[in-house]
């Protein structure tokens, strides 16, 4: 996942913290955490 996408998600959360953007942010963060703990996949 390109860092640019994460920055966009963070910007969306900052500008408009709607349920959708919030869920997307949690999903992206969850993927990053999963990749760190599981080594990918």
Curated annotation (Swiss-Prot):
Protein name: Putative uncharacterized protein DDB_G0287355
């Amino acid at each position: 996942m390109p860092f640019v996408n994460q920055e966009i998600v963070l910007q969306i959360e900052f500008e408009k913290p709607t349920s959708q953007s919030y869920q997307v942010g949690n999903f992206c963060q969850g993927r990053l955490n999963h990749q760190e703990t599981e080594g990918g996949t």
